[in-house]
Structures are given as structure tokens and as C-alpha cells.
Amino acid sequence: MKTFFFAIFSIALGIGSIQSQTLLTETTWGGAGSDVAEGVASAADGSSYVVGITDSFTTDQFGNPSSKIFVVKFGPDGSLSWQRIWNGTTIRGLGRPDVAVSPDGSVYVTGITADNQNDAVLLKFDPNGTLLWERAWGGAASDEGLAVATASDGSVYIAGTAESFGPSSSGLFVVKFDSAGNLIWQRISDGAAGNAVAVASDGSVYAAGTTPRPGQIGNFDIVVLKITAAGSLVWQRTYSAGDVVDPRGRMAAGSDGSIVMVGAIQTVSRRTADIAALVVKLTSDGALVFDKQFDGRATETGDGVTVAPDNTIYVAGTTTSFGAGNQDAFVLHLQPTGKKLLDALTWGGTGFETGAGVAVSGATLMLAMTTTTAPPYSLLAASARLSAPRGTLAVVEGVLADVPGVAADPAAGAAIPDGSTTFSGSFEAALVRIAR
């Protein structure tokens, strides 16, 4: 592992000044194949967990690389603690593994298994890397787990897109398990696709995804649900802006009960299709607090979000407008009101990097990235601005239906790969730690 220490000092950007930031560590992980990070979560002791998909360590019956879900733990100092791959089958390019840490330190990972024509999968590890239990959930068709969140009582929620239930071709699902892996309830919002789930401090559950825009073929809005811990729908909203909006970067809840979603907004003109990163914040009552977009001369997407204890917002994503290389990861720091961009930084080398997730623990910011280049990397201030897409929020009389999904133990188990923190080529996962 190589650790780099340097500071970026305040630079006037016309949006306020960038605060001084110190890079603590930057660590790559993987093997000779492709190791793509998709999410990160932090624990109370300052350790962090990065999840994604790797094909570096196993092959199929024909000797071809076989994709597996991975979870890697890094210590409070950024050093590698342990690494695991789930032995079940998964599919690269279908779904994004996600990770959450419960108050007792248990680690939950969701994703997709290729068994049973694709089911959502939920894995529980202890802080030492022992796989405690595993569940596959779904029906007769394809059901993708895309997000996971935990509650203070130890329960865990997964969300994603299900094709097994309802009259439409897909639905946004939310499934609740207890800490022992027992299925508590399962719900679906028909006609939508799921991307995100979060749990507020009062136990309220929020889920988000996309839904077709009425009367506009090919255009999509964000749909947001508030659900009680017992599985009842409290309210439903749709957010509309541009031609297509989505919460691909998932969502996070603030200490005040508000929720923040990140993703992308696409606006199509006669000559171009502009894609910008999108940040949308709602109150616990479903009112719009703000909507902002982060846009340069090319393409930006929001791929991860967390809300700090002071309710400031961190957004991670990918940019082709700013940074040191062809494509870099970025992180934004926003005021709770969205009125001011406190920081805008990029990270990367001379090749291609993507941002996958962001987490906070104490005074440390953790970023999950993927890189195609070996060190050195650059942490740079981005001369970026936020603008208002001026989207609209609508109240929807939604229906949340119970579904007959099945949760089963796939009994696949976990293995210890021989991943390295020395860059091995191709795509590698990376954890970047910055002092807040």
C-alpha cells in the first residue's frame, strides 16, 4: 500500500472558497482482472467497507473469468484488514452491489445472484469477515438487489427492481429482514424500477427509483416512497426535470428526517444529449427542499451520497469535464440548504476513474472509486458550479402491494481471495480517505 499526504489550499471559485483538504490515504485493491467498486460504508470505529464485482479470482467451467461480489474491509488507518468474495454466481453489468453497517457493527451486502433466473441476494458478515448468513429473494423472473440500509433495531432493508410480480414488466421492491435473516415483509410499487433505500432515525423507510413520465414516451421521472417500519405507505412523490432523471447514486437520510437522492439528469436537444449530476433533497413530509445539478462541458453523474452528522451533504460521482485524466471521480460538499457548494474536488490519474460511493466517520471522508491507472493520482480542486434544474414535485396516490416472494438460503458461502493493494492492471477498486 502506498500512502500519500498533501494539502490543497483555498482557491477562489466564485462559489465561495474551497476549504483546505488533506488526503490521508489512497489504496487500490484487486487482481489481474477487473475489480469494480460500487459502494462504501463506514463503521463507528473509523473502518470502512468497499463492495463491488470482481472477476480476478475465479473461473467458470470453461476457464473464463467468473464474476463475484466482493467486500473488502479497511482499518481506521486505511490499511487492508480482510477481503472476501461470495461464492454464489453474479452478473457483471446487471445491478450494483451495495453495503451498509448496522449499529452493532454487522456488515450487510446486497446484489444479484444468477440463480433462479436472477434473484436479489443479501449477505451478513460480522466485523471480522465471517459470513453469518445469506439469503436469496425473488420469484420466477429477474429480481435485482440494488440498495441496502439498516435500522437502529437491527432490521435491514433491501430495494431494487423486481420483474416477478405485478401486472407491469417491473416494480420497485422493498423487503425487510430481521437481524437473523427472517423475512418480515415484502412490498412492491408496480410500474417503477428501484435504485435506492434509506432509513431515518425514527425508523421511517424511504425508497426511490424511476417511473415513466405520463404522456411522454421515453422520458422518466424519479419516484420516492415513504414507508412505515410495518410496511405501510405514508406518501409517494414524483420528481420531474429535463427529459430523464434517475436516482442511480442512491439516497441517504439526515438526522432531521430529510432525505437526499443523487443521480443524473439528461436533457436532449436536436444536436446533443447533456447529462449532469443531480442532487434532490426532500423533507420528511415529502416537500422539495432543493434540486441542484453539477454540470461541466461534458458528462457528470452522481453515484453516491451521504449526509454528515451536521447535515451537510457529500456527493460522489464521475466527471469527464474536470480533473487530471480522461475521466475522474469527484466529490462535492454542499450546505444543508443546497445554497452553497462548500467543496468540489476530483481524484484520478491519467486514465479513467469512476466515483462509486461516499461515507463519513468522524473527521474522515471515505470515497470508493475505480481506477484504470497505477499511482500517482491527483486530488484537485474543481472550478465547478451548481445550477438549478427547476424540477417539479408531484403528489401521487400510490399503491404499495404485498408480494409472494420467497427468501431462501443459497448456501454458497464465502472465500478469501488473494487480492493485492499493489496495482495489478485493468480495473481496480480504490479507497480514498480525506480529512474533513
Can you say where each PLM-predicted feature lies in the sequence?
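Bacterial N-terminal signal peptides
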Residues: 6-14
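A sequence-level/structural motif corresponding to short, flexible coil/turn segments enriched
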Residues: 19-436
